[in-house]
Amino acid sequence: MSEPIALTDDNFSDEVLSAELPVLVDFWATWCGPCRMIAPIVQELSSEYEGKAKVCKLDVDTAQKTAAEFGIRSIPTLLIFKEGKVADQLIGAVPKQQITEKLDASLSN
């Protein structure tokens, strides 16, 4: 079972912006209830999309620079990056189907 990649301010560029595959980034925090609600979904997606897309998690408390750079104001926020740019976003504890629809769309474009 594949684990989401833990992102930091230091590895964000290499793991996300330079990635050849689309990347789903979950901006979250340990104290955030809705973030804990979608954590199992993000975990599942990491395995389901292995080899097709990267799935990562960024703790906004420990990677404040990156969170600020992307204007993260509400968490959880899920950003989908393609070719180093934000291709789509979801804000809040959204259903898995909504995430997979957006992720699948990024794979087909």
Where do the model's predicted regions map?
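Conserved Rossmann-like nucleotide-binding pocket used by diverse enzymes
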Residues: 3, 8, 28, 54-56
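A short beta-strand-turn-helix
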Residues: 4-23, 64
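Short pre-active-site segment immediately N-terminal to redox-active cysteine/selenocysteine motifs
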Residues: 20-21, 27-31, 74
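Conserved helix-turn-beta segment immediately C-terminal to the redox Cys motif
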Residues: 21-22, 39-58
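Conserved redox-active cysteine motifs that mediate thiol-disulfide chemistry
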Residues: 27-41
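Structural microenvironment flanking redox-active thiols in thiol-disulfide oxidoreductases
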Residues: 60-67
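Non-catalytic, surface beta->alpha helical segment in thiol-disulfide oxidoreductase systems
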Residues: 82-109
